[in-house]
């Protein structure tokens, strides 16, 4: 599964998801106890809210027999970009997450390729980001 490439030519796939989360983790000392911080303070609830937006569209696409994305789904993906922009403006940690993981730019890739498969791959990538975020917060 390869969704796209970064400006440096690195493939954006499930391995990239692990790598980008790992590279954006830091340990913060909070009154004598160490706390793992991802993407400059991205909270689990904020990350899950973003995933919920994608899962709403995922359900429609997954249950469809079409191999291409319907106009309704394409409209929802366009709106998803708006939501990403809004959340980025409200929360610097969300902006960092979106910029480092390319989740907003990948929506454009999904819209351009317009296939069910590429959208489902995008969902897997986003789920991997959430899974690795959970893993690295609990680990170490």
From Swiss-Prot:
Keywords, sorted A to Z: Antiviral defense, RNA-binding
Superkingdom field: Bacteria
InterPro entries with a match to the protein in the record: CRISPR-assoc_prot_Csm2_III-A (IPR010149)
Keyword match Hydrolase: no
Pfam family membership, one: Csm2_III-A
UniProt-recorded Gene Ontology molecular function terms: RNA binding
GO biological process, one term: defense response to virus
Keyword Nucleotide-binding: no
Function according to Swiss-Prot or TrEMBL: CRISPR (clustered regularly interspaced short palindromic repeat) is an adaptive immune system that provides protection against mobile genetic elements (viruses, transposable elements and conjugative plasmids). CRISPR clusters contain spacers, sequences complementary to antecedent mobile elements, and target invading nucleic acids. CRISPR clusters are transcribed and processed into CRISPR RNA (crRNA). This subunit may be involved in monitoring complementarity of crRNA and target RNA.
Oligomer and partners: Part of the Csm effector complex that includes Cas10, Csm2, Csm3, Csm4 and Csm5.
Note: Encoded in a type III-A CRISPR locus.
Family indicated by similarity: Belongs to the CRISPR-associated Csm2 family.
Protein's UniProt name: CRISPR system Cms protein Csm2
Source organism (scientific name): Enterococcus italicus (strain DSM 15952 / CCUG 50447 / LMG 22039 / TP 1.5)
Gene name tied to this protein: csm2
């Amino acid at each position: 599964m390869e969704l796209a490439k970064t400006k440096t030519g690195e493939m954006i796939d499930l391995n990239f998801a692990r790598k980008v989360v790992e590279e954006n983790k830091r340990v913060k000392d909070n009154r004598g106890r160490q706390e793992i911080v991802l993407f400059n303070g991205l909270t689990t609830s904020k990350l899950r809210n973003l995933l919920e937006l994608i899962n709403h569209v995922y359900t429609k696409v997954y249950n469809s027999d079409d191999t291409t994305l319907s106009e309704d789904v394409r409209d929802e993906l366009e709106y998803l970009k708006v939501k990403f922009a809004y959340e980025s403006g409200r929360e610097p940690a969300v902006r960092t997450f979106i910029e480092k993981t390319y989740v907003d730019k990948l929506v454009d890739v999904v819209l351009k390729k317009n296939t069910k498969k590429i959208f489902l791959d995008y969902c897997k990538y986003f789920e991997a980001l959430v899974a690795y975020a959970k893993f690295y917060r609990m680990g170490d």
